[in-house]
């Protein structure tokens, strides 16, 4: 295994999940792995800063436009229509599948329970997938109590 793709929950360094995964990716690069990360596309000044940090340590960042990066029930609102979000999810799964194929990805790792696109794309491509879940069952999943 040489090529690993991470699905990153946000295109920031604002939270523990993003910070910890950055250091894991950096470590894997130092061990000779080819590391790729798909993130949600954001406005240029912030995205350029994000890319700079990734470039400095050899992480290949791929930014994808998305109506909503986290799954439908996750926090963050529901921008646009449901049809628009569903189409965006489908497009992102297809794009991630394209990354898996183009770079001969051996393993896909989703870095939060809130991003599902990598799991679906990996399954379709027949590539192993791991989920690094940082959330706790209590409080952080309160939005599921009504379901």
Give the ranges of each region predicted by the language model.
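Nucleotide-activated donor-dependent transferases that construct or modify glycoconjugates
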Residues: 1-20
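N-terminal strand-loop element at the rim of the active site
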Residues: 8-14, 27-83
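Conserved donor sugar-nucleotide recognition element shared by glycan-biosynthetic enzymes
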Residues: 17-21, 89-92
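Histidine-anchored nucleotide/phosphate-binding helix
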Residues: 21-27
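A short, histidine- and acid-enriched strand-loop-helix "catalytic/donor-clamping" loop
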Residues: 69-71, 116, 127-146
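An amphipathic, basic-hydrophobic alpha-helix
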Residues: 70-107
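An aromatic- and histidine-rich active-site surface loop
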Residues: 107-125
